[in-house]
């Protein structure tokens, strides 16, 4: 299964991933504020992460959640720490915050968490923005990020050629993708297939080309 920290409207990238994963038959749920609570200041300490993670293989967060207010930012950090303790795998969707000025600040906070992240995914928009920020060529950006951070799977979707890419220590994989929802549909299917396809490079290749 899969859980994600999302806003109550379901308009963020992590919530979108959850609804796509559900439509693909993966048991998925969103962790958010309670009814009547203000999302930016909700009581995040009341979340029972242990219980939420009991059936989850993946815990999903999005980078822009850091700009949603103090409570979401603290829940963002807590969820990753609990995922490690509970034996879940952390997935980080790198998306672009609504205020482009804050991108270097939030990307810096993701970098501080790399040790806890198993799958890092860039939307095509953020791939362009962050490669520019880091002064890296977009062409080999994913493998450079993987070398720098040692995150096991660094993925991204590129709209220009409708391709999903996965950088792994043993290979750089390319898969044609419909590109629905900025590549999130590809990511949902990839995350659904990965636990079943085996951890070896062949399994990762098979999971990447699930479409």
Sequence positions of predicted segments:
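Conserved hydrophobic/aromatic "anchor" residues
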Residues: 186-190
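Ribokinase/PfkB-type carbohydrate-kinase core domain
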Residues: 1-180, 191-210
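Enzymes that process phosphate groups on RNA ends and nucleotide/triphosphate substrates
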Residues: 181, 185
